[in-house]
Amino acid sequence: MTRTDIERPVRTQAEEKARYEGNKLSKRLARETTRALSDYNMIEEGDRVMVCLSGGKDSYAMLDILMALQKRAPFRFELIAVNLDQKQPGFPADILPNYLSSLGVPFHIETQDTYSIVTRVLAEGKTMCSLCSRLRRGILYRVADELGATKIALGHHRDDILGTLFLNLFYGGKLKGMPPKLVSDDGRHTVIRPLAYIAETDLIAYAELKQFPIIPCNLCGSQENLKRKEVSRMVQEWDRKFPGRSWNVFNALSRVVPSHLMDRDLFDFVGLKPTGLPDANGDIAFDEPQTDDACDASAPTDGLNEQQIVFSRFS
């Protein structure tokens, strides 16, 4: 027995199991992020990616994963972390600079007192989130220009995408979600969501594993959007009672069949006529819908964009 063996601390069975589960979680999140980046061609050679960091679990995880992938990527790209200090009361201004300095990642803290603007404009008791979000978005677009960023990375995850889909469906009468990649309204910025394939439960576990210095998200005193909270509870209930159901809905977003919906802008129902030729996928009008919640839908589908350059795989 060597001296190193004697000095090495002996892990308990519980510690070994926790270490194993932590490694497995880290690899899974890296793998799913890699898949999203590849499927939607989110990051390309020479990109300068502005990683929007709020101090919450999702954006911390996004930065951590992207930094790991940056080392394994088959091409070069830059990361710069950006936080917007909106001067909310009690915001701990030292936490993020200290954390980012310890990582050695380039970062920029933008200070803009949007809190005072929102509280002055809105009546007392009104939800601040919508106006605050619009102000924040405009500032981040400006900062992206100033920093020369070619991509803006946001930390929205699978549950955020599902929540937006259901909010639009239930309260807006639209089949509209939250895309993994988009161009801003002014046509100048590409916004990406690298965590699109990751469930919130995994991000909660990852934050606990990594012990991120989380900053509370309710410092402004605004109440959480009750409708979004409602659909979030619904998805969480599904995950508990019907494993696979929420993934089925999520996967449906990339398996759209316009001929079997009702949008005349997506399919020419008006001009539809028999062609006299058989169509294997055409006559399913009387098929029974699949109702098995437990089908194999525990993760996003592969191969959405296989021609794209892929990152080194995590086994």
Swiss-Prot record:
Q: Where in the cell is it found?
A: Cytoplasm
**Where do the annotations place [4Fe-4S] cluster binding?**
129, 132, 220
Q: Which GO terms describe its cellular component?
A: cytoplasm
The EC number(s) attached to this protein equal: 2.8.1.-
**Chain segments annotated as transmembrane:** none
Q: Which GO terms describe its molecular function?
A: 4 iron, 4 sulfur cluster binding; ATP binding; magnesium ion binding; sulfurtransferase activity; tRNA binding
Co-factor requirement: Mg(2+); [4Fe-4S] cluster
The catalysed reaction is:
cytidine(32) in tRNA + S-sulfanyl-L-cysteinyl-[cysteine desulfurase] + AH2 + ATP = 2-thiocytidine(32) in tRNA + L-cysteinyl-[cysteine desulfurase] + A + AMP + diphosphate + H(+)
Pathway annotation from the record: tRNA modification
Motif PP-loop motif, chain ranges: 54-59
UniProt enzyme class: transferase
The record, for CDD domains, names:
TtcA-like (cd24138)
Pfam families given for it? ATP_bind_3
Keywords of this entry: 4Fe-4S, ATP-binding, Cytoplasm, Iron, Iron-sulfur, Magnesium, Metal-binding, Nucleotide-binding, RNA-binding, Transferase, tRNA processing, tRNA-binding
**GO biological process terms held by the UniProt record:** tRNA thio-modification
InterPro entries given in the database record: Rossmann-like_a/b/a_fold, TilS/TtcA_N, tRNA_Cyd_32_2_STrfase, tRNA_thiolation_TtcA_Ctu1
> Cofactor stoichiometry and binding?
Binds 1 [4Fe-4S] cluster per subunit. The cluster is chelated by three Cys residues, the fourth Fe has a free coordination site that may bind a sulfur atom transferred from the persulfide of IscS.
Q: Which domain of life, per UniProt?
A: Bacteria
Q: Subunit details for this protein? A: Homodimer.
Q: Which family does it belong to?
A: Belongs to the TtcA family.
Question: What does the function comment of this entry state?
Answer: Catalyzes the ATP-dependent 2-thiolation of cytidine in position 32 of tRNA, to form 2-thiocytidine (s(2)C32). The sulfur atoms are provided by the cysteine/cysteine desulfurase (IscS) system.
Q: What PANTHER family is this protein classified in?
A: AMINOTRAN_5 DOMAIN-CONTAINING PROTEIN (PTHR43686:SF1), SULFURTRANSFERASE-RELATED (PTHR43686)
Another remark in the UniProt entry says:
The thiolation reaction likely consists of two steps: a first activation step by ATP to form an adenylated intermediate of the target base of tRNA, and a second nucleophilic substitution step of the sulfur (S) atom supplied by the hydrosulfide attached to the Fe-S cluster.
Q: What is this protein called?
A: tRNA-cytidine(32) 2-sulfurtransferase
Species name: Bordetella avium (strain 197N)
Q: Which gene encodes it?
A: ttcA
